[in-house]
Amino acid sequence: MKPFAISNALACALALCVVFAGAGHVDASPAMPVMQDSDDADQSKLLEMFVHYVLIAKPELAEANGKALLDSGITDAELATLVDESKFQDRFDRAISRGWNMSDGVSELARTIHSRVEQGRHDLARNPDRITESIKMLVGTLRQKMFGEQRLLAAGEYAMPQLLKQIVDGTDPQLEAEVTKVIEQIKRQAVIPLCVALPDVDAGTQRKICDMLGQIGWPTAAPFLLELAQNSETPENVKLAAMRAYRRVGGQSDNVASQFTALARRYFNQQQSLIPYPGDADNNFWRYDHFAGLQGTPVPTNIFCQVMAMTMARDALVHEPSDATALSLYVAADLRRENQMKAGQSDPIFGDNKQYSPQFFATASGVATCQDVLSMAIE
């Protein structure tokens, strides 16, 4: 743990921070010819043949077709589409798994193909145009609906701006019903995007969001739901929906500030379940705008939890300025954020205040706050 030097001799230390056929499988079909890489090469057939020869343990032929596939100029997105929208996805998974244990050539190809398929899935899932197309598919044929749902679930929170827009617009009841189901299936990744929109959407949409949050049942929503329920300007039917959802997510206290403080503490402790994509370089900080709708700002993942902790602590202080725990969490998260930020990184939410450093704010907050921060560091 790295100590934080604070003026006036106060030292605040902060704890910083595919797949294989069953054994013994015998393919009695005649050997398939090896396709050569050419302008006429059928990439789908090359992939199918690679899978086929891996599963029947023909490494030379598998390697030839795998190389031809990769040399054909196929993109990661095209490769992912071939796998995910084909009828042999299960066989692909088994072939990749078996291929890892075959000869060096096949093993390397299997790993490369698998890596590129995963990257392609990642790229496709978050593509805004593909998300738009996938939403339209929700009211198409049964097959289109299935593919649309799969794509949107893969997109996760990145689909939320367009999904929420359908709820806010409310112009197509059938599509809205399908979108609601998808949002509820996205589960925890949908919670913060929904919560930040709560104060700024119309009453009808507020009630719908409350119902979705209650159905998802993720406790992160608790302070936002209680805040809405206790707002004097909230219509009575929305208050009832908010309180109903609040109970469903496990809310018990009637103190909004304490709820935000508790969430700030969870972020400060860097609970992995609060990070939508722990393996990504960035995670989104969500805001809602009346005109632009839901917008995400990428924040470096290594400081994401501290940025969120500061945000939740600040919200707690809005409701209860004398909340000493919230103030201490804000100061501690600010110090840890500075410590965890890597060279060349910046914080697009709280910025890089060169005039007033985190140490300055820690000192200005007083001895008691610094002592609380020190206690957090050594816990």
PLM segments and residue spans:
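Bacterial N-terminal signal peptides
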Residues: 8-22
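TPR-adjacent "capping" and linker segments in tetratricopeptide-repeat scaffold/adaptor proteins
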Residues: 31-45, 118-129, 133-137, 250-259, ...
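Structural detector for internal amphipathic alpha-helices that build alpha-solenoid repeat scaffolds
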Residues: 48-55, 64-69, 81-85, 107-125, ...
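Conserved small-residue packing positions in alpha-helical repeats and bundles
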Residues: 49-50, 264, 297, 331, ...
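Short, charge-rich amphipathic alpha-helical segments embedded
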Residues: 63-92, 157-169, 288-294, 314-344
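Inward-facing hydrophobic residues that define packing positions of alpha-helical scaffold repeats
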Residues: 65-66, 225, 229, 246, ...
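TPR/TPR-like alpha-solenoid helical repeat scaffolds
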Residues: 77-99, 237-251, 258, 325-355, ...
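Short coil/linker segments at helix-helix boundaries
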Residues: 78-80, 95, 262-312, 336-368
